[in-house]
Amino acid sequence: MILKDLFTDISGFAEFVPGIDSNTNLSLLNSHAVTAYKRIANIVSVPVYNNIIKKGAGELYDHLRTALANLTMANDTVFDVLRKRKANIDIYKSEQEAIRRAYYENYYNAMDSL
């Protein structure tokens, strides 16, 4: 599981993404994390990605965690809206787009730092 390489639990994941629902779990997000991993590893290369994880705690590690978490959440935004609608929680399209943009901005900032 991609997320387990960088995060031990959802609270660790939540440190890097704003506004995450506390009912979310890492396994629910993993399919989006696979896509995020592929995009990030394609940019920085798989060996560099793995070296950052191997080195562990540090500035690059935090940038990688921020990038992966925010891109994962950006990819999950549409499905999060569906889950909320099933729970009878309305969300406006403009809110959804603002949330997605914020996640992408955080992702791009982290990738620039990497």
Q: In which residue ranges do the predicted regions lie?
A:
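Catalytic-loop motifs flanking and including active-site residues across diverse enzymes
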Residues: L68
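Conserved short "hinge" loops at termini or chain/domain junctions
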Residues: M1-R65, F79-L114
